[in-house]
Amino acid sequence: SVYPNPFNPQTTIHFSLPEDSHVELCVFDVKGEQVITLANDPFEKGTHSLVWNASKLSSGIYFIILHAGNQYATQKCVLIK
């Protein structure tokens, strides 16, 4: 989940892992271009939170994509400045 959403300029991404996993957490714009990698590391099972500060980006819709093990999750978020 992402809270707050819409956000300005930062939001917190919450996710849970059922087992230890390598996590890749990336943000893409509506054109499909990757704008940042927030994580590309091993994480232990459990609940985690990461803060994304988007102060250098333009207002718009962004997609946060979480890849953990063989699972993918996508969350749409809106940056309003």
Predicted regions span which residues?
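C-terminal outer-membrane/trafficking sorting elements
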Residues: 1-3, 7-81
